[in-house]
From Swiss-Prot:
Keywords: Antiport, Cell membrane, Hydrogen ion transport, Ion transport, Membrane, Sodium, Sodium transport, Transmembrane, Transmembrane helix, Transport. GO terms for biological process: proton transmembrane transport; sodium ion transport. Mnh complex is a Na(+)Li(+)/H(+) antiporter involved in Na(+) and/or Li(+) excretion. Na(+)/H(+) antiport consumes a transmembrane electrical potential, and is thus inferred to be electrogenic. Does not transport K(+), Ca(2+) or Mg(2+). Pfam families: MbhD, MbhE, Proton_antipo_M, Proton_antipo_N. May form a heterooligomeric complex that consists of seven subunits: mnhA1, mnhB1, mnhC1, mnhD1, mnhE1, mnhF1 and mnhG1. It is found in: Cell membrane. This is Na(+)/H(+) antiporter subunit A1. The keyword Transport applies. GO terms for molecular function: antiporter activity. It comes from the Bacteria. It is a multi-pass membrane protein. It comes from Staphylococcus aureus.
């Protein structure tokens, strides 16, 4: 097993160990044990920077099911390394922050188990080369995030948010599964790199469009893009460390990773370019607009996260235009990939810090309601400093890193509007317009975030707690991120050669050299747009109290949340009514539906698929076989008209004994003996049960012939006969019985073929079947013992009274 595999599996192993440690080390905060895991992974990933800088990649394989093309293949290039550094680096800071945020009285064993499970799943997503393995880790992120969001499960809002995120992201996961299966059909491979190398085969496939749509749905749901963004604001009910981790650097970035990774395959389609770009821009505008009217600090950050993800998504869509050009023209549009990667890093730094500060404010004051907050500037000066740095970076104000990536975003929108491709030159003017409007509202909610908390009147009477500055443990992580915001803003070259260029080269088909970011590069359209954004943003902030009321009056029926909640109520009710229409308490009706569907399916298949019935190799029917069958049918027929339970049991046993005799004639004496034993025991058990039944020796109701029952019974029998004959006459492969005949004696050293098959060749089946019976028996025994114990206790109470 390689170190790369260990890096992915390590969090999953610790996720199993942590609950055990929690039981034995309750005096020490469990976070100190967990902290070592992401730090070790982060240090290991740092050692791989030189590998990706030189243009090399790391490919490691762990055999799993090689015959099916299913191996645990890990592939690390610049893009995978970038995400791995974010997952482990931000993960380390989040764990450190959680030590100060969560008290020892919390269920820390569960929390860190879920967190490490999520961390390992995210590493698996960004490093897997096998799409099936990627999908398994993808769904594991949804499952583990559900556990994290619902951590405070005593809160109804937490349960609602967790269910909502699970439903939407799992829906996207199923779409992703369909998409990757359609990708694997033309290439006959599950390897992502093989698919990229043979992208032309996929593009010529009739499944290309369907695969593209399904994969985009999977990515959009995970990264909370329009209109699937509604799960993210409700997921804010999770503890703040979860929000800082999942919703700034990891889970919501998984969709961006998928789009970036699949761009070499789908960039040839204009549908990919238009859809990814427009969905990103619409998400940017809509979420930034909604962020301004939120009354909860986490609500503001939730919609701001959706907005920033939309910006990155749009840049990935614009960058795909580069696949339709060559040389310098291609590099012009590929600059959008560079901007997307840079902003992805920047967003993780400033948004992670802002989430942590929000948690600090909540921890200090007991509320996140902006109506109750204000005037905390002198009370929480360190938190104020961190907030100003990171919020201004989010607003796109120099000299912070967010300004550089925001400028790059505006440049890409102006560049894309001039592309003579896919009719972009006709409608492309919308790109910079939407980008500028979205950036204006981004500026507004970023500045208002600072003002809501630290400026205005201090209202101690409305705060559940007396406000105070939080501990150093809660300030250290956001302070580190705020420092990175400044460093990456003033010295972006630290990232360009080591991280950004290798990551961009993983997405783009041409090599990007000499990536540079500057605070000022002339009076360009992007710079002038920035000035317009500042001016309009300040005007909107000054008039905030007037126009924000209009947004807050938005009718509920015009929101996606309204329709989600309505569907969540209507669909279960409709499903229940539909199910109750055919599933009843009457077993006979249920069996009619089940067997009727079987008969219908059988005969539809028979009349739609060509087949042959071959009677040449059928053994001749002997007279004693006919006699046994007549006896069997007679016993079964008499059961229908039996008026005594005892007679029904005897006739049912006669059917079983007749089958045993047939086994003898077909040279299977062991099966016959087994059947005899089973029938004898079954008959004895029936008689014992019969003894405890009410004393009714005869049925009072009059039996009448029911045509439906007869047709269903006859249809099932006929279906089984026809299926057996078709299967016997249409064998496309050699019978497996020959294998047993050749190897039953030399491999298993047995003389009875049936016994050897059951005990050796299918020994695991027999073992598990026996285990199931044993467990069922223990369960029945336990219930009987508990019942007797309760009856004894009840009698004792009565005697005492």
């Amino acid at each position: 097993m390689s170190l790369l595999h260990i890096a992915v599996i390590l969090p999953l192993i610790f996720a199993l160990i942590i609950p055990i440690l929690y039981r034995f080390f309750k005096r020490i905060h469990l976070g100190w044990f967990v902290l070592s895991v992401p730090i070790v992974i982060f240090i290991y990933m740092l050692t791989l920077i030189k590998t990706t800088m030189s243009g090399n990649t790391v490919m490691k394989t762990l055999n799993w099911m090689p015959h099916f093309g299913m191996n645990f293949d890990l592939y690390l290039d610049g893009l995978g390394l970038l995400f791995s550094l974010l997952i482990s680096g931000i993960g380390s800071l989040v764990v450190l922050y959680s030590i100060g945020y969560l008290s020892k009285s919390e269920q820390l064993g569960n929390f860190y188990c879920y967190l490490l499970l999520f961390m390992g799943a995210m590493l698996g997503v960004v490093l897997s080369d096998n799409v099936i393995i990627l999908y398994l880790f993808w769904e594991l992120t949804s499952f583990s995030s559900f556990l994290l969001i619902s951590f405070w499960r005593e809160r109804q809002a937490s349960i609602y948010g967790a269910q909502k995120s699970l439903i939407i992201t799992v829906f996207g996961g199923l779409s992703l599964l369909g998409g990757i299966i359609l990708l694997a059909i033309p290439t006959q491979s599950f390897s992502i790199q093989y698919m990229i190398q043979h992208a032309s085969e996929i593009q010529n496939s009739p499944f290309f469009i369907f695969a593209m749509i399904l994969i985009m749905i999977g990515a959009f749901t995970k990264s909370a893009q329009f209109p699937f963004y509604i799960w993210l604001p409700d997921a804010m009910e999770a503890p703040t460390p979860v929000s800082a981790y999942l919703h700034s650097a990891t889970m919501v970035k998984a969709g961006l990773y998928l789009i970036a990774r699949m761009t070499p395959i789908f960039a040839a389609s204009q549908g990919w370019v238009w859809t990814v770009t427009l969905v990103g821009l619409i998400t940017l505008f809509w979420a930034s607009l909604n962020a301004t009217k939120q009354q909860d600090l986490k609500g503001i950050l939730a919609f701001s996260t959706v907005s920033q993800l939309g910006m990155i998504m749009a840049m990935l869509g614009i960058g795909a235009i580069s696949y339709h050009y060559q040389g310098d023209d291609s590099k012009i549009y590929a600059a959008a990939f560079t901007a997307a990667i840079f902003h992805l890093i920047n967003h993780a730094t400033f948004k992670g810090a802002l989430f942590m500060i929000t948690g600090a404010v909540d921890h200090s004051t007991g509320t996140r309601d902006v109506k109750k907050l204000g005037g905390l500037l002198t009370i929480m000066p360190i938190s104020f400093t961190i907030t100003v740095i990171t919020a201004l970076s989010m607003a796109g104000v120099p000299p912070f890193n967010g300004f550089l990536s925001k400028e790059s975003f505006l440049e890409t929108t102006f560049t894309a509007s001039q592309a003579n491709l896919f009719s972009v030159d006709t409608l492309g003017y919308l790109f910079p317009i939407i980008g500028i409007v979205g950036s204006v509202f981004t500026f507004v909610y970023s500045i208002k975030f600072i003002m809501h908390i630290f400026f205005g009147q201090y209202k101690p009477e409305q705060l559940p707690k007396k406000a105070h500055e939080v501990s150093i443990l809660m300030l250290l992580s956001p302070a580190i991120l705020a420092t990175l915001v400044i460093v990456f803003g003033l010295f972006p070259g630290i990232l360009t050669n080591s991280i950004i260029e290798p990551a961009t080269s993983s997405i783009n088909h041409t090599v990007i050299d000499d990536v540079e970011f500057h605070m000022f590069h002339g009076l360009t359209p992007a710079f002038l747009s920035t000035l317009v954004i500042y001016i309009l943003g300040i005007l909107l902030i000054v008039t905030f109290s007037y126009w924000v009321k209009l947004l807050q009056r938005q009718p509920g029926k015009l929101t996606f949340n309204y329709w989600y909640n309505r569907s969540a109520n209507v669909i279960p009710n409709y499903s229940e009514k539909m199910t109750n229409s055919y599933v009843t308490d009457y077993s006979r009706n249920n069996l009619v539906i089940i067997f009727g569907a079987l008969i219908l399916l059988t005969f539809v298949t028979i009349f739609s698929v060509p087949f042959n019935i071959n009677f040449k190799d059928v053994s001749p029917i002997r007279i004693f076989e006919v006699c046994i069958v007549i006896l069997l049918l007679s016993a079964a027929f008499l059961i229908l008209f039996a008026k005594s339970r005892l007679f029904s049991i005897i006739m049912l046993s006669a059917v079983g004994y007749a089958v045993s005799v047939l086994f003898i004639f077909f040279k299977a004496p062991d099966l016959a003996l087994t059947q005899f034993v089973v029938e004898s025991i079954s008959t004895a058990l029936f008689l014992l049960c019969f003894y405890h039944l009410p004393n009714l020796n005869r049925y009072n109701e009059k039996r009448s012939f029911q045509l439906t029952n007869a047709l269903i019974a006859g249809g099932v029998g006929l279906s089984v006969i026809i299926i057996g004959l078709i299967a016997y006459g249409n064998r496309h492969f050699e019978s497996i019985s020959k294998f047993y005949q050749e190897h039953v004696y030399d491999l298993a050293h047995g003389k009875n073929m049936v016994n050897v098959i059951l005990v050796d060749f299918r020994g695991m089946d027999t073992l598990f079947e026996s285990s199931v019976l044993g467990i069922a028996g223990l369960a029945v025994y336990t219930m009987i013992k508990l019942r007797k114990k309760r009856q004894t206790q009840g009698n004792e109470v009565k005697n005492h009274e």
